[in-house]
Design a protein with these regions (language model features):
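Active-site nucleophile elbow and catalytic-triad environment of alpha/beta-hydrolase enzymes
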Residues: 158-177
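Flexible "cap/lid" loop of the alpha/beta hydrolase fold
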Residues: 86, 90-129, 133, 167-168, ...
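The conserved beta1-alpha1 loop
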Residues: 6-10, 74, 188
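Short beta-strand/loop motif that positions the catalytic acidic residue
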Residues: 180, 186-188
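Active-site loop/oxyanion-hole signature of alpha/beta-hydrolase fold enzymes
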Residues: 31, 37-70, 86, 110-114
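Conserved HGGG/HGGXW glycine-rich cap/lid loop of the alpha/beta-hydrolase fold
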Residues: 3-44, 69
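Conserved loop-alpha-helix segment in the C-terminal half of the alpha/beta-hydrolase fold
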Residues: 190-223, 236
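Gly/Ala-rich beta-loop-alpha elbow adjacent to hydrolase catalytic centers
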Residues: 72-77, 81
Length: 239
């Protein structure tokens, strides 16, 4: 019997980044949806977007599910899952983290990135009209999509939107998350150059007991090589 997946995107992205993965999963008899977070549609008013707006969006999607689903988060969505999952544990059959930020209690994403990166993004957001971090093309090409074809880089960059900085600066609490008994898996694209080697799997130690599935690809392999990511997700499924 097929599973139903709910995919949560990370910073700058929208639900569209999961389209290729969803198509691959549907070929295998699964169903899926990928909501776009507040402020992440083109033309959205991003001023005033708060961290809780993201969490509330996820919990509202979960509330509409008729039966438990597989909840998947990529990149910055990792810590959104840490905050949202405890609010709707009965709606979640399994949690899967894909090259995701897993934060310690009381920390924000900016606490786990190089200080110069956090400082540069903060300055850029302060200079913007809506407190957003603009799309940083060099970062996308040389870290998020290192080694990917230029045409794929261009395609992704054309769809990214400015990121409300609250996602990066808000500390989370993990007390409720660490008490969950939901099975957890990590699907890790092992060619990811967006952080130093070992950083993502190091953060994943905060998940406790989890299953690790490694696949090939960059941080953006969900967009550039969705078949490989879908295969990893299927391998990770708990029946």
């Amino acid at each position: 019997m097929g599973k139903h997946f709910v995919f949560i995107h990370g910073a700058w992205h929208g639900g569209w980044c999961w389209n290729g993965v969803i198509k691959e999963l549907e070929k295998q008899g699964h169903t899926a949806q990928a909501p776009t977070m507040p402020g992440h549609n083109p033309g959205d008013d991003r001023s005033g977007i708060k961290f809780d707006d993201y969490v509330d969006k996820i919990t509202s999607v979960l509330a509409k599910q008729d039966s438990p689903i597989v909840l998947v988060g990529h990149s910055s969505a990792g810590f959104l899952l840490q905050m949202a999952a405890p609010k709707s544990p009965d709606k979640i059959q399994q949690l899967i983290f894909h090259n995701a930020f897993i934060l310690p209690d009381g920390k924000s994403q900016f606490d786990l990135v190089p200080p110069e990166a956090a400082e540069g993004m903060t300055a850029a957001a302060n200079a913007s009209p809506d407190n957003c971090v603009p799309v940083i093309e060099d970062f996308v090409r040389h870290q998020l999509m290192a080694g990917e074809p230029v045409e794929m880089q261009d395609a992704l960059i054309s769809r990214l939107v400015p990121q409300p900085i609250a996602l990066f600066t808000t500390p989370i609490t993990t007390r409720d998350f660490i008490n969950l008994t939901i099975p957890i898996s990590v699907v890790f694209s092992k060619d990811d150059a967006s952080l130093p080697p070992g950083a993502y799997l190091g953060m994943a130690q905060g998940l406790g007991d989890y299953q690790l599935i490694e696949v090939a690809g960059s941080h953006e392999s969900l967009f550039t090589n969705p078949g490989v990511v879908a295969e990893g997700l299927i391998k990770a499924l708990k029946y």
